[in-house]
Amino acid sequence: MLSLTNIHKKYGSHEVLNFMEWKIDRGIYWLKGGNGSGKSTLFRIISGQIPFKGEVQLDGINLRKEPINFRSKISFAEAEPQYPLFIKGKELFDFYVDTRKAERKQAEALADYFEMTPFMHNTIGSYSSGMLKKLSLICAFIGDSDLYILDEPLITIDSASAEKLYILIKEKASEGKSFLLSSHQEVSSDKLSVDQVFQIIDKQIIPIHAAVTD
């Protein structure tokens, strides 16, 4: 499903990632690693947001050769989302609905689900960190992607919102969608079944263990 080959990424003289191959099938995957280990860099590479050396393919679609088609299959929620502070939540919401040709009812249902509907007409600059995170998750789930990349999805949100996120991930996974998650916190095994855990160690992606089940 997802294949990365001959990946090399550095910032200036600082090498962050350097590995030959990493492949995963459909499923839910958790990526561990400390600050600066390369988790966010890896996610930005896969989502086509930064330049890199190597090849990335999703279901046979090559990021370099078919960038628009490739990106249309991926949703990415950053660890620390940064949006223009002067726009309203609804304006960002509408942008994602339009660009992803999504059903407005689906997007509105997501806003209700994460209890953000009353705040959608407020400017993003007035949002708390938790509200901002929930907005980014709503935007990530708008539309119908094949791969959802959620970088630190549990930070700044309360336990009730985390529970809702777990449920949504499981619902999407049951529809054949895949997830790449990263978290400094332990993913609760009684909340979410994870097919494989990986860790970035010395610029390499190393499998830790598999089948963290309910």
Each PLM stretch: what is its role?
Residues 2, 16-19:
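Conserved structural motif at the start of ABC-family nucleotide-binding domains
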Residues 46-47:
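Helix-to-loop junction immediately C-terminal to a conserved catalytic motif
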Residues 51-70:
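Conserved ABC transporter NBD signature motif
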Residues 80, 85-101:
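Q-loop/switch helix immediately C-terminal to the Walker
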Residues 104-120, 141:
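Conserved ABC ATPase "signature" region
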Residues 137:
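Hydrophobic anchor residue at the start of the ABC signature
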Residues 142-146:
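A short, proline-enriched helix->beta-strand linker immediately N-terminal to the Walker B motif
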Residues 152-153:
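Walker B catalytic motif
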